């Protein structure tokens, strides 16, 4: 059977594309292929409520594992509670919603060849489609220079209520090591909490055992005892420099990359859910029979515009990674979280105004002026990948 849209990978980006397509065009036959045996319990996708359009927030809120009305941060010289909603989605809930929408997911499907017309599985089966998108995770690109956000999280069932009422987006009062380090907390119930040791590092190597042990150490320091029920890990790109036009010139043929594979993530935070929702809207908004090249053009236009709007965010990353000593990186975030509430929300949503940008860099500089000036050019960092 020929499908209208074939999505390689059944993760976040393609899951949201499937939901959007089936909602906008219920006549389309949408197929997702993934090599895994089923949805992973090793992924938690979170975002702030204002990061999403009202339609996407309404669509995803019922699917979320948890929703919270507020959040907080903690630094050595500053702590703050923010009245901004926050929520988390897991792989099982997303996969279930995709199937209920009428799209098909085929697990245990190892793709040997993916092209603009379809996929050939390792078993020899050929699947044709009108449009083919590739959302099988991040790949290095000479057009994208990155640092890394690395984490290992342990979810524990505590013996007694842990007493954490809201997400702790960053607890940077911990010892700084391997770059900017903080603990991220998600309290899913009074006795269930995810504790994630996170590092903003120059290198992408991840010592799972060490970071898991650090997460357990944090729990003990809080007086929490209990059993580990789940673990997750991640190595996310943090964009320092990006040539979107060059990237898409390299992808002028073949399947269309989406998700992390296309560099669709918030440059500073690494959050990918809001950008995935925006791309899903682009895909679902096209009229007529779906075609790989038509989708390529629309997604490329979105990508180039998004990269242009994110230039300032990449500058902030260059200041963080190239302009600040690793053990002092936390001071930039500590200063940022003294900014107005609305500015912080717009930062996470990728909607900073020019006035917001000036507010962030005005005043006592977080790094020496000469160092900041050296961080301005983006092109030299791309040459590192040449």
From Swiss-Prot:
Supply the alphabetized keyword list: Carotenoid biosynthesis, FAD, Flavoprotein, Isomerase, NAD, NADP
Q: What is its EC number?
A: 5.5.1.19
Locate the residues binding NAD(+). 4-34
Query: Per its UniProt record, what Pfam families does this chain match?
Result: Lycopene_cycl (PF05834)
The record's SUPFAM superfamilies line, in alphabetical order, gives:
FAD/NAD(P)-binding domain (SSF51905)
GO MF term (any one):
lycopene beta cyclase activity
Q: Which InterPro entries match?
A: CrtY (IPR008461), FAD/NAD-bd_sf (IPR036188), Lycopene_cyclase_b/e (IPR010108)
Provide the reaction this enzyme catalyses.
a carotenoid psi-end group = a carotenoid beta-end derivative; all-trans-lycopene = gamma-carotene; gamma-carotene = all-trans-beta-carotene
Query: Which GO terms are recorded in the biological process aspect for this UniProt protein?
Result: carotenoid biosynthetic process
Q: In which pathway does it act?
A: Carotenoid biosynthesis; astaxanthin biosynthesis
Cofactor names from the entry are: FAD
Described by its record, this protein's role is as follows: Catalyzes the double cyclization reaction which converts lycopene to beta-carotene.
What family is this? Belongs to the lycopene cyclase family.
Question: What is this protein called in UniProt?
Answer: Lycopene beta-cyclase
Q: Which gene encodes it?
A: crtY
